[in-house]
Amino acid sequence: NMQPYIQIGAGKNNTEYSKLVGILNKYRKENKVIFTIHQSIWLPSDDFYINIASSDRQIREDSIKCIQKNIEFARDIGVRDISFHGGYATDKLSQEYEFAPLDSQNSISYEEAYDNSIDSLNKLKKIANNDIKLSIENFNFRPERRYLFSRVGDFDRLPEGIGVILNIGHLYYTQKKLKQDNYINEMINALSNRVNEIHINDNDGSEDLHKLVGDGKIPIKEILEQIVKNRNIPHLIIEAHRNRHNYSDDDLANNILKLREIAKL
């Protein structure tokens, strides 16, 4: 008997804070749902893109503040899980529109970026103070976009107490990109005990398409089976690109039912 699980994703909030908290708490209690938060709706400007790995002090500080505001927001609306991106090996990022390719400016070394990211994560861990679980997302392997945290060894320095939101679409895309048939197995073996949530979407291996479950080639049931070998199933979130693929409300509702069947492991 799964309790509905709704992720508040990245975007822009135009509602006054206390009013928004009231609306969400009313909805949560009346509908018995669990909320979770991904990235942030608290950005300093519309074109700001969170990068906790930046060497630009202002961008890194503002990025940490975005997540800190999330932690405060989480405490006010009964959220236990927050997830976000571990960063990029670049000082500044921009994006023309949601889900467009990120434009990296002022690249920095991966070593420097990981140092910055780990430092930011340790700061955020103190702010979360063990009552909010923090997770970073595994990225696609795309060096041209300066992504961090895409291969097994990238997670070796992840601070204790920081979890992972495992994106199955990113796993499959990266396995095909690296041409490493054992990549998904190795990632799950290395990270399964740290997985707090799972982003589920489908693709054909050629691109990170974020399609609904069953619309691509990913063996989603088999991947979930491997994750739950030695643990309970984490919370599952369908993360599909509604506008790009012209999905209707019915498409989304039916896909939730489809995932519930797949997740009966």
Task: Label each residue range with its predicted role.
Residues 31-33, 132, 230-234:
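A short helix->loop->beta-strand "cap" motif at the edges of active sites that frequently abuts
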Residues 1-70, 75-76, 162-165, 264-265:
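N-terminal pre-domain/capping segments
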Residues 10-12, 41-43, 86-90, 138-142, ...:
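Active-site-proximal loop/turn and secondary-structure-junction residues that shape catalytic pockets
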Residues 53-163:
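Active-site acidic/histidine proton-transfer and metal-coordination neighborhood
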Residues 61-80, 91-97, 159-265:
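Histidine-acidic metal/acid-base catalytic patches
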Residues 1, 17-24, 95-97, 119-128, ...:
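Distinct, well-ordered alpha-helical segments
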Residues 25-40, 120-127, 158-160, 220-225:
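Alpha-helix-loop-beta-strand connector modules within alpha/beta enzyme cores
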Residues 7, 35-37, 81-85, 133-137, ...:
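A structural signal for short, well-ordered beta-strand segments and their strand-loop junctions
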